Swiss-Prot record:
GO CC list: plasma membrane
Record-linked Gene3D superfamilies: Cytochrome Bc1 Complex, Chain C
Similarity comment text for this entry: Belongs to the cytochrome b family.
Protein origin, superkingdom: Archaea
Function description: Binds 2 heme groups (b586 and b606) which are not covalently bound to the protein.
Family matches, as Pfam families: Cytochrom_B_N_2
Residues reported in the UniProt entry to bind heme 1: H87, H198
Subcellular location: Cell membrane
Biological source species: Sulfolobus acidocaldarius (strain ATCC 33909 / DSM 639 / JCM 8929 / NBRC 15157 / NCIMB 11770)
Protein name in the entry: Cytochrome b
Amino acid sequence: MLVEEKKSGIIDSILERLGINEAPLFRTPDYMYNISYWLGAMVAASFAYTIITGLFLLLYYQPAFAYQSTQTIINSVPYGSVLLFSHLYGSYIMILLAYIHMFRNFYKGAYKKPRELQWVTGVLLLALTLGASFFGYSLVSDVLGVNAIDIGDQLLVGTGIPGATAIVGWLFGPGGSAALSSNPLVRSELFDRLLGWHIIMVFLLGVLFLFHFMLSERYGMTPATREKPKVPSYYTKEEQEKFNPWWPRNFVYMLSIVLITWGIILFVPNLLANINGLPIVINPYPAPQAGSPQAVSVQPYPPWFFLFLFKLVDFLLPNGIPITPILTIALLVVGLVILMLLPFLDPSDSLYVTRRKFWTWIMTTLAVYLVELSVWGYLEPGVPEPTSAQIEFLGPPLVIIGIIVYLWPTERKTKTVSTTATDSRVIKMNITPMEILLGAVGTLSFAATLFNFIQFPTLINGIILVPLGLFAIYALRRISFYVLGGKPVASVGNTSSRISLRKKIAFFGIIALFVVSLVLLGLMWTLPSVGPQATYAGMDLGVILLLWGVAIQLYHYEIFVKE
């Protein structure tokens, strides 16, 4: 017995006592070890990161002196700027990933039976994420945060609903004007209220996420359409017996995803913090303090994730009257309810997106409108838009998407690929949502750095420009290859010797990444730890976590992919 325990290892023995492998956790087929199936894990990793950093920031945040304590965190607390900027962008990336996760699940039919309740809770999680981010965004007491409070205040009061004023007082206390008060008790009343709501919503997010996780483990990830083309789409317990148990393979793969996600969350904002001329809505640094002379020249914007709503309130009705707050709120509520009830409104039993043409048209148009209205809201804030302008901007996408979806062939030839745990043949996606996200971030970062380098040709801007340029070229080539109809790359024909060679390359790749990460780790301790220059250490740590995540991905390939 003792010999068996030594062979199994201490960790295996502990997990055996806990009954992890007997727990009702989803067993995963080989082909699902693809980032597109794990977007929910990336959202969860972002959520966990924002909670951890938020707890540290809470130690230094003073509601009565919100803006001053924020500046203290940036300029005086060791690695405070790294914590604050990455906390902010952790929520930003969580929102982006939540949207990508939602639309990906729609196109894959993952909202259909038996996952209806999972979809409903997912939509509620997105709404709570936006709400928690709104209150957190306003805690800084900069002009943008206070303007966001005022916009929300005016929108709710303007509905004229009985009790609207009481609801506003319940949410915002004394209102945004309290941020301008010279009395710290008045300021504290506002920001204590905002902080309270921020924490409450994060708590509700955590509770609902646990329920969402339980539902996802109940039926597992939605199988590929080539495996289960119709509802109900899930693997039976008998089928799951052939797949990989949660420990250790799922744990290893998820760990790599967490590290890569955290690396991105750390690297992106700390890089952007060193780029001048960024749009104010995505700048990691706070805007000028509300009520300060510098704030007068700042264009009022809501958080970027509410820019679509910001533009919507600029719309004029056909009679030339501005859209009313009650109509705006009604549109949002009705849209949210329809989105939640989508599993019950779509009667089709097929998971193929080409057999769900009406809802594919609606959801694709929604995705385009979210982006289009957000960009429009940033470029032309507060400009009243007549019906003719609305038709000019919103009409073409509606028609073009409708024509494409209608003409898209319904039938599609697919190849059947074995999903047993012993089958190492995997069809690789040509491009994943994560690659698109990283490509967009890299390309935008390159464009901003290039613009900044032209204006301020400093050494650091030139150094940053080179890797960003190479990454942008690579990302654009990948995306263009996909758009122009490039064929997916498959590893079905891989021989045992080729897999063996790749495993050897992976082994030496792990060693190389480990050595590079050690060098970067040593470098990090030589970089400034206080003030804005601490962002260099933040970028360094982000790269280290990315390298560790990639190394674990290579380890996963070397250990678990069978020859």
